[in-house]
Amino acid sequence: LAVDNAIQDVKQDDPHKLRLVIVSSHDSSVSCHISFIHFRMFCFNQMNKLKDSNPLTFKHTRSINENVSRINSIIDFKKGEFTKSIQDYKLMVRKEIKEEQVKEVLERLYFDKWNNKKVCIDRTLKTERDKNYLDLVEVKQIKENLEKEFEQNGRTAYALCNGINYYYNHQQGASNIKDESTRARIRMEQNYYGKNANIIDKSKELCLAL
């Protein structure tokens, strides 16, 4: 759901919106989870969850009126956080970057997935080499995304952040899952309250620090 009066341009014709996301509980343990999430409307990338925006959990025993009251009591505060988030991305727009900085961000973002790991280069001879960040499926796709982002938006920290986010919002999916609607649902769940939410937030921190 869109939050009233919570839309701002990061740059010309590049609006971002604050949205209230409601996800029902699959196991019926609670009624629903609610988060406030920052979206880029041009490609509908989830940019990041707002700081300290852990999902609100509504128990079935709470009244509807009490739930609504809880939401209304924090919306104004979240609008302030959204404005701060917009300023972060405006700063990224002004940060031109080089290939070495792209490498730095991707290496740090996926450090645990390549560090101290091996890649088999010959199964018959059982030879291996050290794994590096370029071996990762995520990085290969993100590098392709960056070619388009840099062409459209320049070589900026903002373009780098969007190239990473686009992968998690529109491209990630297990190769054994062929149904795109199922892949999209899994991506959404991981982005809202799963491991991908942390990766998206970390990518913003790394790009902002360049």
Listing of model-derived features with the role each one plays in the protein:
Residues 6-210:
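Intrinsically disordered, low-complexity regions enriched in serine/threonine
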